[in-house]
């Protein structure tokens, strides 16, 4: 029995030695491989202080705290990005306001095809309810009366035509010119007629008054 126990212990000890030797050989081979590989260059990332001069480390004022970077002033890139975003938002709002339908007198949004419909809507809202507005619509939608391009005017018995781009003629050009002198035929004729009429009326009134006076004296 003792011989068997010794053999078992010897086998265990030999197995442990072989395990240690194999592990040590594996470690040596891995170290050799690492030594054979070239060292990769270390990548250095730019610090916040190098990118922005307005950033100061917190460790300078508080040495007890861990090193951290604080941005005292916004950088130009952040300002430009915020300005660009604001401009885009303003442009979108302007575009929406331009594309929005026409609203009249706080009414719901309704799109009108032409200005005539807008005019008709305004007229109907301004007038009191219960009145017919068809005549107003006909009056507002009718074409404007434009004068003819050529105007014929009578001057001294002749027909003259104005050129198309000439200014409008005055009223004095439509009628022939006549002098208003005292010895004009119309003036003399009117003067004689009025004098004769006034003479006849005066004679009739005088005759009636004289007749009444004579009758009054005869009675007394």
From Swiss-Prot:
Subunit and interaction comment: Homodimer; via transmembrane domain. Interacts with ced-3 and ced-9.
Region (Required for initiation of apoptosis): 187-207
Family matches, as InterPro entries: BNIP3
Post-translational modification comment from the UniProt entry: Ubiquitinated and degraded by the proteasome.
Keywords, sorted A to Z: Apoptosis, Membrane, Mitochondrion, Transmembrane, Transmembrane helix, Ubl conjugation
Protein name, as recorded: BNIP3 homolog
Described function: Initiates apoptosis in a BH3-independent mechanism possibly by recruiting ced-3 to mitochondria and other cytoplasmic membranes. Has a role in lifespan and tumor growth.
GO cellular component: mitochondrial membrane; mitochondrial outer membrane; nucleus
Region annotation Disordered: where it falls in the sequence: 1-66
A Pfam entry, by short name: BNIP3
Residue ranges with Low complexity bias: 21-48
Family of the protein in this entry: Belongs to the NIP3 family.
Biased composition (Polar residues): 49-65
Gene: dct-1
PANTHER family: BNIP3, ISOFORM A (PTHR15186:SF5), RE48077P (PTHR15186)
């Amino acid at each position: 029995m003792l011989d068997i126990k010794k053999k078992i212990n010897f086998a265990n000890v030999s197995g442990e030695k072989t395990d240690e030797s194999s592990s040590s050989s594996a470690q040596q081979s891995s170290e050799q491989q690492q030594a054979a590989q070239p060292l990769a260059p270390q990548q250095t990332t730019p610090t916040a202080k190098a990118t922005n001069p307005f950033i100061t480390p917190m460790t300078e004022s508080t040495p007890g705290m861990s090193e951290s970077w604080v941005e005292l002033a916004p950088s130009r890139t952040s300002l430009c990005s915020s300005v660009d975003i604001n401009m885009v938002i303003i442009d979108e709002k302007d575009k929406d306001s331009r594309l929005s339908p026409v609203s009249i007198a706080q009414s719901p949004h309704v799109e009108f095809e032409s200005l005539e419909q807008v005019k008709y809507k305004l007229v109907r809202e301004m007038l009191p309810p219960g009145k017919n507005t068809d005549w107003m619509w006909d009056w507002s939608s009718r074409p404007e009366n434009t004068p003819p391009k050529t105007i014929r005017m009578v001057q001294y018995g002749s027909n003259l035509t104005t050129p198309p781009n000439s200014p409008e003629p005055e009223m004095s050009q439509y009628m022939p010119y006549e002098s208003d002198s005292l010895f004009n035929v119309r003036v003399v004729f009117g003067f004689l007629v009025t004098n004769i009429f006034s003479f006849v009326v005066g004679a009739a009134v005088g005759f009636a008054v004289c007749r009444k006076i004579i009758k009054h004296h005869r009675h007394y």
